[in-house]
């Protein structure tokens, strides 16, 4: 396997992991709470909730000196356990009885395991109405334009991310050193610093098993992609014209208005750029 291919795989893995913890899991936990807001507001809410929860979870377990993969995973599933308990509170005996009845049906061969775990298809079809189809069709132009912005980020920054294998800023080894010290429950090892960035890198390293230097090497591109999405989504919520946010983001993406250092910093995994996400 070539180094270019390996780097692309690593970028995809880190991107998927970061998306899971900052968008998908918050969506599962908070979608009913945020249902009353617009789509851009919901996305911003999920993203902020995911990042802030992970950062403060790492702070908590680090200060308690119990940080590790197990404690972080347990801390990550606590919100879902609380939500499930509140949802099922008072109905637990009924749920147990229903499960036992289904098990009895399985033993008698009346239903299969697929029906036991996923339910009947006709009930699911009833939930998906024509209005849902029309609602999703309405967002097709936004999805296409967002995909074009993502493709633009890959075009502008992707080649450098894939073909330059080392660190791209002189202070990245120091940040790597700080993150590695957190493996020993030693936070702020080289001084007090705005540590949310380090908490996120450490979480990706500890929970998903990535080497710290790998995350530091490829997260810069993932971070840059989310920076442009963090610019696009609020504009989509604020602008009356549907296409203005995409035009504005594209102009900033392809324009050359600032010094070269402004754009070169996007190639590195740096805390200042991580702060631009918020």
Regions found by a protein language model. Name each.
Residues 85, 138-168:
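Transmembrane signal-anchor helices characteristic of membrane glycosylation enzymes that use polyprenol
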Residues 1-136:
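Membrane-embedded, hydrophobic transmembrane alpha-helices
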Residues 163-168, 183-198:
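Membrane-proximal lumenal/periplasmic loop motifs of glycosylation machinery
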Residues 190-212:
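Short hydrophobic/aromatic helix or loop-helix immediately within or flanking a transmembrane segment
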Residues 13-28, 162-173, 216-224:
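Hydrophobic alpha-helical transmembrane segments
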Residues 62-66, 160-164, 260-270:
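Membrane-interface helix caps and helix-loop-helix hairpins in membrane proteins
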Residues 27, 58, 177, 202, ...:
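Transmembrane alpha-helix boundary and packing residues in multipass membrane permease domains
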